[in-house]
A protein has these predicted regions:
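Histidine-acidic residue clusters that define the catalytic metal-binding segment
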Residues: 144-162
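M16/MPP (pitrilysin/insulinase) zinc-metallopeptidase core fold and M16-derived inactive scaffolds
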Residues: 41-97
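Phenylalanine-focused residue identity feature
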Residues: 7, 25, 34, 106-108, ...
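His/Glu-rich zincin catalytic helix
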Residues: 1-63
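Active-site-adjacent, His/Asp/Glu-enriched structural segments that form or flank metal-binding
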Residues: 76-149
Length: 162
């Protein structure tokens, strides 16, 4: 079988950042899938699943309520490898265009207090699997160390040279 494009990224060189994972057409509209990479793959511990689940709930809630972007949000969800999240937006977009949106999103998570939206049995399939303190800590770290200091290396995928 052919190797899928996401397996052609050089994960040995991949940094934390915001990357265009793919762009697809749905009808006449382009949708852009972003890799929101919070951890360096295989070089630092993955995100704790409870923290990642909480980030999912809070980020999805924030994004779907953001006055500028809410109509373009298709999906926000965690990566199976636990090193980040995927964001799918309507439009032909690049990574630099959403840095401010991601900064606002992760600032929201980093400063969130109170009940986690959707963390109730009737709303969530695993409502007990949350860790707000770690979600806040990971989000603050991502803002301070990546989003406030990003360069091209944090915005453009390193592809493997085969």
């Amino acid at each position: 079988m052919d190797k899928i494009p996401s397996f052609t990224i050089d994960h040995d060189r991949l940094l934390r950042g915001i990357y265009v994972s793919r762009q697809d057409f749905i009808g006449n509209e382009v949708v852009t899938t972003f890799d929101i990479r919070m951890k360096e793959p295989n070089r630092e511990p993955a995100l704790h699943i409870g923290a990642l689940h909480t980030i999912e709930h809070l980020a999805a809630t924030y994004l779907r309520n953001d006055s500028e972007w809410k109509e373009r949000v298709v999906y926000w969800g965690p990566m199976g490898c636990l090193t980040g999240n995927y964001l799918i937006l309507k439009g032909n977009l690049n990574s630099a265009e959403i840095v401010d949106l991601m900064r606002r999103t992760f600032e929201f998570v980093a400063s969130f207090e109170g009940e986690i939206p959707g963390a109730a049995p009737k709303d969530c399939g695993n409502y007990l699997l949350h860790d707000l303190p770690m979600a806040r800590w990971e989000s603050r770290k991502f803002v301070d160390e990546v989003l406030n200091k990003n360069t091209e290396d944090n915005l453009i995928y390193p592809f493997r040279e085969e």
